């Protein structure tokens, strides 16, 4: 988790214990549930592990590799911005898309033609994607 930890330092932050635990569990292939207060860094606890793994891959597979479901559009926007921020700094070639009911037809078409590495979406939008 060297690159992600360094990214935190560059932001003027220190990883929280629960974030480090999540990163470790992810690298060990474990599943779990994360419960922490609003604004405590849950997004980076999960995305940090995903990006760290991607950082070491020489050739990234095409298509969506990480799907993030959230029930609220506003939260989806915040998560997409946070995950893209980290991705842009550590793995600029990996994009994080956003798909909600507000996504334009032209953007949906682009997403279909060239899927991003990560996609943040709502259950309703995922349902429409899978139809």
Spans of features found by a protein language model:
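Conserved P-loop/Walker A NTP-binding site and adjacent catalytic elements of P-loop NTPases
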Residues: 2-131
